[in-house]
Amino acid sequence: MTARALSELVDQGWAQALEPVREQVAQMGEFLRAELAAGHRYLPAGANVLRAFSFPFDQVRVLIVGQDPYPTPGHAVGLSFSVDPEVRPLPRSLANIFTEYTADLGYPQPSNGDLSPWAQRGVLLLNRVLTVRPGTPASHRGKGWEAVTECAIRALVARDTPMVAVLWGRDAATLKPMLTGSACVAIESPHPSPLSASRGFFGSRPFSRANELLTQMGAEPIDWRLP
């Protein structure tokens, strides 16, 4: 991640929303450069670290929270749960998300694991921690990203416009106290990982439930269809 002004790296709405943590973002850039200097790589690629904030702040209607990026080289792309179109096989959590997507919405299995169409339609795919060392899950937790992503979530809630937060798993559920705005609703289920998907993620209907809630609040539902 380069040492550029925040306004050059993210959507202008997000640049304003993240102004309270602008210095923290700069410090995280310094942390990543120190990692590289010490011989440690990080994922995703620098240009994608803040990718979730490249889509319009004012258009976010659904928030899907991840923990930290995929630690497998070639998988992390800066959007929670998403991978590049050519990645095969899919990460198992994403495969389970697609199983539920098909069961919930009746759409065919997507042709690849690229979730960027969702991001373009108002879904913020946000990891709580935005980087990770390759092969070492959770290695960048507690380093400072949480302050940035929690600021982002508070800014979304403060807009007071309809938003549904989809919280998968215990880690995401800890954010629920922040999601208390009059126009914000949270839906929870177990995580889609193979360890917990059968304990209540399958059958949770997150996509149709999110759209039902958006419609009830007078907002446009999400077009969840993927190619």
Curated annotation (Swiss-Prot):
Subcellular location: Cytoplasm
EC numbers on record: 3.2.2.27
Keywords tagged on the record: Cytoplasm, DNA damage, DNA repair, Hydrolase
Annotated GO CC locations: cytoplasm
Predominant location: cytoplasm
BP-aspect Gene Ontology terms: base-excision repair, AP site formation via deaminated base removal
Pfam family, one: UDG
PROSITE patterns for the chain: U_DNA_GLYCOSYLASE (PS00130)
Gene3D superfamilies the record matches: Uracil-DNA glycosylase-like domain (3.40.470.10)
Record's catalysed reaction(s): Hydrolyzes single-stranded DNA or mismatched double-stranded DNA and polynucleotides, releasing free uracil
GO molecular-function terms, A-Z: uracil DNA N-glycosylase activity
Disulfide bonds: none
Keyword presence, Transmembrane: no
SMART domains for this protein: UDG, UreE_C
Active site: 68
Entry similarity comment: Belongs to the uracil-DNA glycosylase (UDG) superfamily. UNG family.
Function per UniProt: Excises uracil residues from the DNA which can arise as a result of misincorporation of dUMP residues by DNA polymerase or due to deamination of cytosine.
Name of the protein this chain belongs to: Uracil-DNA glycosylase
